[in-house]
Each structure stands twice: as structure tokens, then as C-alpha cells.
């Protein structure tokens, strides 16, 4: 009995240790900082696109006006949800432009890594307000941007490859207190960086799992024609791939491989043995979506999201090598 108790105790302690190691082992922020740059640039691009015809998206004269947008969330047309935004109540074009200019400025600072501790939560909050207002004009690109911005604000994503890092180095000789150290954190391993990384990894696994299960409900994913129907659809087609019609075994294999990969991504991405193959396939799939189906921004963001499984030490090594090569070329 004592031996059995010891075995159970050892197993439980091992489980607790593994849990602690998974969540609370300090991690370098370098991969998160690269993701901050990509997410910030794509957020900036998204807001600049809105600025090309702002009145068509926001205000009382928009395609979906303020009142209709509010009713889509408050239960008028169905179940009420928690999607709320103050943009429902702004009708003045001047105020909307001032607000949008502020949003663009904040997003640009977030991308550059300027006052990231402040601009990262602001960029996420403003994006969420737009997300709740623009019901009916959203796509997966917007959702991926929002969840990545949400987790990046939890971590010191501006501690390297940023204006914040330059400012900290520039004034390194002066000890300015706790607030300064919080505002301009060092590029060192932290628990928060690891927690943000794990949350992003798990979120991505959930996205792929439910995406794969949803695909499995469709007959075309079982009979092998889903990829063909996708690339032959003129509504999305940006690259003529109709030549695949002459190779049914090819597009059938592509269909079944994609379905298998998406459903089992959440299991196969964790072991080091299978991770390179899973990530490589993710790049191939999303690059194909970007080039063949015209969803370039979505493809870029999904490839970027998969970077969260790349070791920050490896990212740091690559950046250092690129800098050295650049310096050698300049010399």
C-alpha cells in the first residue's frame, strides 16, 4: 500500500512539475518582439485601408450604420452578446477622423515598439472597438490580428527590436527607478513572456482543431475535391490553378493532407520530431491561400502566428547573423 501511495505521489508531483515548467519557465521575448512588429504593421495596414473610405465603414452613413451595427449585438435580431463599442455612438465625421487618426498613431507606435507597455494595450483595445463596430465586414484576418495583439500586450514585446530598446540603451547609464524599468524593460527571460507564448500557442491549436473539425463535416473534404473547388472558384481566384483539373490524384492528396494536418496540428506541433514538418506544412498551406485565393493578409498573419512555436533563442541567433552580414556588406 505504501509503495502504491508513493507511486501515485511521484506521478502527481511529476505532473505538477511539468505543469509549472510549461507555464512558468522564463522565456526570452525575441520571438514575441518579431510578432509585435508583424502584428503592428498589419494592424496599421488595416486601419489605413479603412481610412481610404472611412465614412463607408463608420458613422450613420456607413454601409452598416450605427443603429444597425448596435442591433446586431444587443439582441434585436437574435441573441444578445458582449460585443460592445463606443463607436456606435459617434456620428460626427470630424470626431471619427480624429479618433481614427489617434488609432493610426497608436498602432504605428506599437509596431515601432515606442512606449509599448502603453501602446500595446491601447492598440488591442482600439482594434476590439473597431471589431465590434464593423460586424458584417470582418474576416479571419481581423480575428487573428486581435487575438495576437491581446496576448502581445501581456508580455514585454517591446523589450527588443524596438524604439523602447534603443531608448533604454541610450540612457543605460542612468537609473531612473521602477517606473522607468517597467516602461522600458530589459530583453531578458521572463515568466510573462512564457505565459503569453503558451496562450498564443494554445489559441492557435484551438483554431486549427475546430477549423479541421468544421471541414470534416463537408463531403468535399472526404471525396478529395475541396481543394479543387477552392482554386477554381472565380470569386476568390487570384492565381489560375485550373490546370489541377488534369491531375485529380494531386488535388485529392492535397485535400486529404490538409484535412489531416489541420485536425492533428494540436497534437503534432508539440513534439520536436514532428514540429518542423507541421510548421512547414502550415507555411505551404497559408502561402497557397495567400497566392491562389487572394487572401494575402490572412495568409501572412497565419504564417506569422505559427512563428510562436519557433524558439526565441533561434530567432535571436538569426537576427544576430543578419546584422553581422549587413555590417560586413556595408564595410
Where in the sequence are the language-model features?
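Alpha-helical membrane-anchoring segments
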Residues: 1-331
Amino acid at each position: 500500500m505504501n509503495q502504491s501511495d508513493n507511486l501515485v505521489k511521484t506521478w502527481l508531483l511529476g505532473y505538477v512539475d511539468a505543469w509549472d515548467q510549461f507555464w512558468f519557465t522564463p522565456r526570452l521575448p525575441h520571438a514575441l518582439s518579431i510578432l509585435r512588429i508583424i502584428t503592428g504593421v498589419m494592424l496599421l495596414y488595416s486601419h489605413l485601408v479603412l481610412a481610404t473610405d472611412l465614412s463607408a465603414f463608420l458613422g450613420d452613413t456607413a454601409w452598416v450604420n450605427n443603429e444597425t451595427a448596435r442591433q446586431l449585438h444587443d439582441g434585436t435580431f437574435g441573441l444578445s452578446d458582449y460585443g460592445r463599442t463606443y463607436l456606435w455612438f459617434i456620428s460626427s465625421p470630424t470626431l471619427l477622423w480624429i479618433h481614427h487618426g489617434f488609432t493610426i498613431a497608436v498602432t504605428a507606435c506599437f509596431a515601432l515598439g515606442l512606449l509599448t507597455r502603453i501602446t500595446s494595450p491601447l492598440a488591442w483595445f482600439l482594434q476590439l472597438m473597431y471589431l465590434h463596430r464593423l460586424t458584417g465586414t470582418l474576416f479571419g484576418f481581423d480575428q487573428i490580428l486581435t487575438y495576437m495583439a491581446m496576448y502581445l500586450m501581456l508580455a514585454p514585446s517591446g523589450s527588443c527590436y524596438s524604439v523602447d530598446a534603443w531608448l533604454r540603451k541610450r540612457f543605460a547609464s542612468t537609473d531612473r527607478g521602477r517606473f522607468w524599468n517597467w516602461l522600458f524593460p530589459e530583453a531578458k527571460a521572463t515568466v510573462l513572456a512564457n505565459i503569453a507564448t503558451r496562450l498564443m500557442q494554445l489559441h492557435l491549436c484551438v483554431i486549427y482543431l475546430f477549423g479541421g473539425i468544421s471541414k470534416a463535416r463537408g463531403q468535399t473534404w472526404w471525396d478529395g475535391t475541396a481543394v479543387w473547388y477552392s482554386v477554381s472558384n472565380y470569386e476568390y481566384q487570384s492565381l489560375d490553378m485550373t490546370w489541377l483539373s488534369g491531375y485529380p490524384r494531386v488535388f485529392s492528396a492535397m485535400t486529404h493532407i490538409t484535412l489531416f494536418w489541420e485536425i492533428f496540428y494540436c497534437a503534432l506541433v508539440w513534439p520536436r520530431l514532428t514540429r518542423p514538418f507541421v510548421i512547414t506544412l502550415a507555411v505551404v498551406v497559408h502561402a497557397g491561400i495567400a497566392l491562389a485565393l487572394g487572401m494575402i493578409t490572412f495568409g501572412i498573419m497565419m504564417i506569422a502566428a505559427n512563428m510562436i512555436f519557433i524558439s526565441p533563442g533561434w530567432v535571436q541567433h538569426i537576427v544576430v547573423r543578419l546584422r553581422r552580414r549587413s555590417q560586413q556588406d556595408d564595410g
